[in-house]
Amino acid sequence: MNGKYLSQLLDAKNKALTADVLIKALQTDSRKIQPGDLFIAYPGLQVDGRDYIKEALDKKAAAVFYEANQYNPSIQTKVPLIPFENLQHRIGEIAARFYDDPSCEMEIIGITGTNGKTSCAQFIAQALQSQGIRCGVIGTLGYGFLGSLHKTSHTTPEPIQLQQAFAEMRKQGAKAIAMEVSSHALHQRRVEGVQFDIAVFTQLSRDHLDYHGDMENYARAKELLFQQPGLHTGVVNCDDALGKRIIAHYRHQLTLVGYSANGVKDDRVSSVIASAIQPLAQGFSVEVQTPWGEGTFTTPLFGRFNISNLLAVLSVLCLCEIPFDKALLELSQLRNVPGRMQVVDSQRQPQIIVDYAHTPDALEKALTALREHCQGRLICVFGCGGDRDRGKRPQMAAVAEQHADQIILTNDNPRTESPLTIIQDIQAGFKNKNAVLVKLDRAEAIRYAVQMAAVNDIVLIAGKGHETTQTIADQVLPFNDVEEAKKAL
């Protein structure tokens, strides 16, 4: 049977309200309705889906679920029209039923935090795959299996697309999924209906305040991952204030592992700590103490923040019953993630690094990491996204001025905002803005930075990372920082 009967998608409260019909697919966009589909109608940020119920019925929708609050449909039809309270928050559960609860048949590892989500998800998938456990990923780089990811519009897809992705990967033999869980997705309840097994918290720093309003609301959104029904295990950064709060709040409900790159042991939980860190010519040697054993691993990855990410990954691998010695070996073999401290061409000088750093904290960590390896000048190319948190712009300027020797400001994704307004917001954070170059054309800025760099210099191109487009006004144009840097070399 292709599809599900309506009764299979409803809970006991709604089942008595209608006759049964076969549902072939779920849609929240009336333009995509095909005969036999279920139309799910609720008020969104831009439009109210309930205004399009008649259009969905004209396209032969088999049934309609609609948000009941402040709405009474005046439509005469034999098609089942079923009211729901808080429908937007229940779409995930409905979609999970439609796809036979795929997350229940796989180990779902949810990762939240301002920075580190993508790296941790990709590293976990690499390591589990290497150990013979077929592992999919869902996140900023797309969903699917490493090497063949499908693009998504959000870090965490909308509920129907999310459950469909789970179902596709289950069909292709996935036994585990490493999944980035954004604060937006948690706040909007996109992950309702997902059975998480392990929740990972990386760290919290300023971002998305245009959406959340303040840091406390942002923190509470991140915490929601640890409140998901059925969750049994958490992995938490003990070096972070919110991490400490999560441990205090949830240590009695969940089995928690705390990790620390600063050697901090929290006696309230099992601890994975870096007891000694030794910089190498490229990367680090790290001694670790864990509940599963003690040992040393080396990594070629740039940045002490990546040590923190690797401790989270080590914790997850051991919780997934990978033997400790094998887990350590996997850490040493992990490959860098596209757009995350990515070396453009390791065979040529100057060294050029592309990184997704688009918050003050991430930019500071990237620059600090590169300073440790820099024998000449550290040159930083960055901008800030338009239509996003304006408050972080001067903060990023202050960070760049403190840690870089030369700064070139440029466009990131200005979107509908004036590029000059964005630059002015950034410049407000500089003590000496006259020392800062401005080149709005990002390709020109990258070319200028590379050509001005001497052999021992390092150029950091920050903000866009893996992205392959640039959004200027209403145009989405092809653009790739790595490719532009290669042209400039």
Swiss-Prot record:
A motif (Meso-diaminopimelate recognition motif) lies at residues 412-415. This is UDP-N-acetylmuramoyl-L-alanyl-D-glutamate--2,6-diaminopimelate ligase. One of its GO terms (molecular function) is magnesium ion binding. InterPro entries: Mur-like_cat_sf, Mur_ligase_C, Mur_ligase_C_dom_sf, Mur_ligase_cen, Mur_ligase_N, MurE/MurF_N, UDP-N-AcMur-Glu-dNH2Pim_ligase. Transmembrane segments: none annotated. Catalyzes the addition of meso-diaminopimelic acid to the nucleotide precursor UDP-N-acetylmuramoyl-L-alanyl-D-glutamate (UMAG) in the biosynthesis of bacterial cell-wall peptidoglycan. It is an enzyme of class 6 (ligase). ATP binds at G113, T114, N115, G116, K117, T118, S119. Belongs to the MurCDEF family. MurE subfamily. One of its GO terms (biological process) is regulation of cell shape. The modification N6-carboxylysine is found at K222. GO terms for cellular component: cytoplasm. The keyword DNA-binding does not apply. Its cofactor is Mg(2+). Meso-2,6-diaminopimelate binds at R388, D412, N413, P414, R415, G463, E467. Carboxylation is probably crucial for Mg(2+) binding and, consequently, for the gamma-phosphate positioning of ATP. Coiled coil: none annotated. Its main location: cytoplasm. It catalyses: UDP-N-acetyl-alpha-D-muramoyl-L-alanyl-D-glutamate + meso-2,6-diaminopimelate + ATP = UDP-N-acetyl-alpha-D-muramoyl-L-alanyl-gamma-D-glutamyl-meso-2,6-diaminopimelate + ADP + phosphate + H(+). Pathway: Cell wall biogenesis; peptidoglycan biosynthesis. It comes from Coxiella burnetii (strain RSA 493 / Nine Mile phase I). UDP-N-acetyl-alpha-D-muramoyl-L-alanyl-D-glutamate binds at S30, T155, T156, S182, Q188, R190. Keywords: ATP-binding, Cell cycle, Cell division, Cell shape, Cell wall biogenesis/degradation, Cytoplasm, Ligase, Magnesium, Nucleotide-binding, Peptidoglycan synthesis. Its EC number is 6.3.2.13. The keyword DNA damage does not apply.
